[in-house]
Amino acid sequence: MSLMTKLGFRALVASCLIAAGGAAHAQVNVLITGVGSTQFPIATANFVNEASLPQQVTSVVRGDLARSGKFSNVDAGSTPVPETASVDFGAWKAKGANAFVAGSVNREPNGQYKVNFILYDTVKQQSLGGLSLTTSNDNEGMRKTGHKIADYIYQKLLGVRGVFNTRLSYVQRTGNVYKLLISDSDGQNAIPALTSKEPIISPAWSPSGTKVAYVSFELRKPVVYIHDLPTGRRYVISNQKGNNSAPAWSPDGQTLAVALSLTGNTQIYSVSSTGTGLRRLTRSSSIDTEPFYSPDGKWIYFTSDRGGAPQIYRMPAEGESAGAAQRVTFTGSYNTSPRVSPDGKLLAYISRTGGGFKLYVQDLQSGAANAVTNTTRDESPSFAANGQYILYATQSGGRSVLAAVPSDGSAPPQILSVQGGAIREPSWGPFMQ
């Protein structure tokens, strides 16, 4: 199979091999398949007054912490505990909890709800602070509040910003219908941004988290669009002769790198976020595709078969006219789909290994690379905004699913799937503004 066939149409070919049926954007199921080697035991008591809510905030918090693989939920019992209550640190420590969360939900005169909570360190017997959050009394509002609380806990106890209150984009295929879906980080609250009878591939979040670029085949050829999520407006960014594919945002959100077959072999170009100022960046006789900007905006990583087989290279963001491309991957003979971590230290990519395709992570300073999954049909990696996790597409039980794995490979992947449908092409959104 040629590099163009493998990369340019991988999602289309894969999805056509999957028989799918069932309801549109069905509920996503999350299967926790493993946990980290070290977990922080925490007890989250039921919040006062939350029992009658359409969505209990604490169930979202516990679910987020469990899915992270970094925490173990200690049974806090069924009795609600307000944040104003005095804390018996010894009793909670005796239950096995090194941290404890208490809180309440109260209706405001304007109909909104105030959610208050405090996080306690039971070992040091001290408060780690808390938040007072205002939300609407609906499923979406309460879930978002729960994600914010989990983010607070994650950062206070682990020293790293949490990503529970972020969003995912991915493509679901049900029969001959394709949907570009936007969901919470746990796959819940999925909302279709686009529905089409033609394939949709390569969604990519803007740095602001308000736009998603993607490739649609609705014009009977691949065309790059940008979708403005708050307004629902979408517009064409690249509809050049031949294939238009693989959009990638610059860190400032002003430019996109795209792969175009405008002159024959696919090459990498840049274009403004308004669709103007097309500029060619690579000038090789090979296939150059799958561009991705480094977080500092100085480099573009990309896949090329200029060495005979696909490998990952990088060049100055201004293009090869500003400096020759340099090969980056040397482990394995077939490497594609480069994605750089938000701190610029790690490179995630897909490597053909033993007849399968596995997600690898390479330290960009040392060059050391290791597989981080136990699956063998991996594709489309995407780092979480904090760099701690990688979302990717794979196969599980004969179905197309999404999976999330710690970027250091310290725990098995967690599977996100839908009943009767195939989900692919994931992209993990940035921190919410």
Swiss-Prot record:
It comes from the Bacteria. Keywords: Cell cycle, Cell division, Periplasm, Signal. Pfam families: PD40, TolB_N. GO terms for cellular component: periplasmic space. GO terms for biological process: cell division; protein import. The keyword Cell cycle applies. InterPro entries: 6-blade_b-propeller_TolB-like, PD40, Tol-Pal_TolB, TolB_N. The keyword Cell cycle applies. Residues 1-26 form the signal peptide. It is found in: Periplasm. NCBIfam families: propeller_TolB. Part of the Tol-Pal system, which plays a role in outer membrane invagination during cell division and is important for maintaining outer membrane integrity. Belongs to the TolB family. PANTHER family: PROTEIN TOLB (PTHR36842:SF1), PROTEIN TOLB HOMOLOG (PTHR36842). HAMAP family: TolB (MF_00671). The Tol-Pal system is composed of five core proteins: the inner membrane proteins TolA, TolQ and TolR, the periplasmic protein TolB and the outer membrane protein Pal. They form a network linking the inner and outer membranes and the peptidoglycan layer. This is Tol-Pal system protein TolB. It comes from Burkholderia pseudomallei (strain K96243).
